[in-house]
Amino acid sequence: MDAIKKKMLAMKMEKENAVDRAEQNEQKLRDTEEQKAKIEEDLNNLQKKCANLENDFDSVNEQVQVAMAKLETSEKRVTEMEQEVSGTTRKITLLEEDLERNEERLQTATERLEEASKLPDESERGARVLESRSLADDERIDQLEAQLKEAKYIAEDAERKYDEAARKLAITEVDLERAEARPKAAEAKILELEEELKVVGNNTKSLEISEQEASQREDSYEETIRDLTQRLKDAENRATEAERTVSKLQKEVDRLEDELLAEKEKYKAISDELDQTFAELAGY
């Protein structure tokens, strides 16, 4: 009888131990399922964050493309301004050559006046009048030369400004190339994140750190784009200023051409008077 009681007691204890072990296993199972659910939730969150990063990357890439288009437009405008400056410089060169020819003609007229001064006293008064006019023309030509030098200086200054604008555009282009390289690095990082998602159970913490780093790089891209946009605005402002300078220079060239034409007409009048004076002297 005692043996039966002991056996029953042993069976009861074994049953209780089995129940305890079952409860422990059930608890472990629940804990495991909760851990699994948490890991799956973290995985879903990381996948969403990765998708958001891809969308943000596409947006940044579009902004870079827009910045490149604006840069190309600015470069075209600067090229056009350089061509206009080149044309204006050619006009100034032609004006200088024309002015030199006018000076040679005036020198010839002066020599003729000197010859006329050697004639009899009856022609001396007419020669003095012509000489006075010639001196006035000399002063006018000197004034024109000074104005032409000033216009040439303005053209050279405009060329220097264009060179500076071209240099800054080249720097902006280098910065833009760097900005293009950074999205490629971001794309490679996203691919790396996708690979790490396959082993999320062991690399969850590492993925979270990578996500934070990607977010920081995104902020850096946005800052770079803002800087490029500002530089493009500066380039556009410089191009606008160059247009105003070219317009001012063109007006100055037109004015010089008008004054040169007037000087030619004065020279023709002097030549006619000289011819008339020589004709009168020949009559004496």
From Swiss-Prot:
InterPro entries cross-referenced by the UniProt entry: Tropomyosin
Region annotation Disordered: where it falls in the sequence: 202-223
Protein family membership: Belongs to the tropomyosin family.
Note on domains (UniProt): The molecule is in a coiled coil structure that is formed by 2 polypeptide chains. The sequence exhibits a prominent seven-residues periodicity.
Primary role: Tropomyosin, in association with the troponin complex, plays a central role in the calcium dependent regulation of muscle contraction.
Keyword set includes ATP-binding: no
Protein name: Tropomyosin
UniProt entry tagged with the keyword Coiled coil: yes
Biased composition (Basic and acidic residues): 214-223
Alphabetical list of Pfam families matching this protein: Tropomyosin (PF00261)
Self-association and partners: Homodimer.
Polar residues: compositionally biased ranges: 202-213
